Amino acid sequence: MLDREGFRPNVGIILLNARNEVFWGKRLREHSWQFPQGGIKYGETPMQAMYRELHEETGLHPEHVKIIGRTRDWLRYEVPDKFIKREVRGHYRGQKQIWFLLRMVGRDCDICLRATDHPEFDAWRWNEYWVPLDAVIEFKRDVYQLALTELSRFLRRPAQRAEKPRGPRMSRYPRVIGAQAQTLTIVDTSVVCSEIEVEASTLDEMPPHVIVGK
């Protein structure tokens, strides 16, 4: 379903915990990270689409979250031709999104990346509200910045923009570097709130929550 300008209606979700940290998901078998998002189906309202996408991508239900705010209008981004299927080139331009800011009132172990047979993410983590967007695919970065900026006014304590990096502490955002194996203790929240050990690679910091086997 496209509008007259070739944009697909879509919703984006910025999910906060009690510390104003933001949920980031690592795209399945890729090295990019993003917020939950998805298309609005015919007959759906943006809110209905948001709750559906929230469950499909994070396993959370409406009772696990509280809506804090939403963007006033659509935010748009164009998709480069190399990412567009050949049969829709010339018709499809990109996405127009309504963004929702949610507060999670459930527990971390309520998050399940395998809520459907077609998961979007294979790992997730919490990060500070303002972080560099290096790990987000380039053509989405401006929209992410616009959404974060507009919705920051709803935070209980306004989040401060990150200062310039001061040594290794600023490496906590999801940034891809060369492969380097290491053993970490993580939590597989798709099963129970318990600790397990896995081998980590390709990320400077392995996220603390991943899918492990079936």
UniProtKB/Swiss-Prot annotation:
Keywords: Hydrolase
Documented EC number(s): 3.6.1.-
Highest taxon of the lineage: Bacteria
One GO MF term attached to the UniProt entry: pyrophosphatase activity
Pfam families xref list: NUDIX
Cofactor(s) of this protein: a divalent metal cation
Cited HAMAP family: Nudix_RppH
Job description of the protein: Accelerates the degradation of transcripts by removing pyrophosphate from the 5'-end of triphosphorylated RNA, leading to a more labile monophosphorylated state that can stimulate subsequent ribonuclease cleavage.
Family from the record: Belongs to the Nudix hydrolase family. RppH subfamily.
Name the record gives this protein: RNA pyrophosphohydrolase
Provenance organism: Burkholderia orbicola (strain MC0-3)
Lineage: Bacteria, Pseudomonadati, Pseudomonadota, Betaproteobacteria, Burkholderiales
